[in-house]
Swiss-Prot record:
Keywords: Cytoplasm, Protein biosynthesis. GO terms for molecular function: ribosomal large subunit binding. The lineage of its organism: Bacteria, Pseudomonadati, Pseudomonadota, Betaproteobacteria, Nitrosomonadales. This is Ribosome-recycling factor. The gene is frr. Its main location: cytoplasm. The keyword Protein biosynthesis applies. It is found in: Cytoplasm. Gene3D superfamilies: 3.30.1360.40, Ribosome-recycling factor (1.10.132.20). GO terms for biological process: cytoplasmic translational termination. Responsible for the release of ribosomes from messenger RNA at the termination of protein biosynthesis. May increase the efficiency of translation by recycling ribosomes from one round of translation to another.
Length: 185
């Protein structure tokens, strides 16, 4: 029973951490990466479709993402989807490729993005603490129903606290890495 509570808490914390990683990957830093466009949906004959299902997304050079669509009729739809996204990018079509140059971030924009990632990290920490609270409440129920002893309850709560501390440290590490990436010129 205690093992189930711990396992459930750990799985939920891992899911929260994975969600944070996905959120961080959507925040644009100074250098391009192909995952930056993963969440952009293109209107493909009336159906919103992820850009990676319609084209090859590659790094053309150190400051440019290259998109080579498989259907040559959707260049304008891809450009429009990227322009309408909140990334602040200005794509252009060059022969058979949509080129997305990555302008350098201004100092003000870097600070705004840093605030955003700090907020996302804090939300992940709160989620971890809520998972801990739910696990501890479940342990209290088991104790109340006399399914576990008090010392088992205390030991399990300590283990869940260690688990929470470990995942929160992981969140802090991800935040530090992302902040350094954002502030690098």
């Amino acid at each position: 029973m205690i093992a189930d509570v711990k396992k459930s808490a750990e799985q939920k914390m891992q899911k929260s951490l994975d969600a944070l990683k996905v959120d961080f990957s959507k925040v644009r830093s100074g250098r391009p990466h192909t995952g930056l466009l993963d969440h952009i949906m293109v209107d493909y004959y009336g159906t919103p479709t992820p850009i990676k299902q319609l084209a090859n997304v590659t790094l053309a050079d150190a400051r440019t993402i290259g998109i080579i669509p498989w259907d040559k009729k959707i260049f304008s739809a891809i450009e429009k989807a990227i322009r309408d996204s909140d990334l602040g990018l200005n794509p252009m079509t060059v022969s058979d490729m949509v080129r997305v140059p990555m302008p350098p971030l201004t100092e003000e924009r870097r600070k705004d993005l840093t605030k955003i990632v700090k907020t996302e990290a804090e939300a992940a920490r709160v989620a971890m603490r809520n998972i801990r609270r739910d696990a501890n409440a479940h342990l209290k129920e088991l104790l109340k129903d006399k399914l576990i002893a008090e010392d088992e309850d205390r030991r399990a709560q300590d283990e869940i606290q260690k688990l929470t501390d470990r995942y929160i440290a992981e969140v802090d590490k991800l935040l530090q890495t992302k902040e350094a990436e954002l502030m690098a010129v």
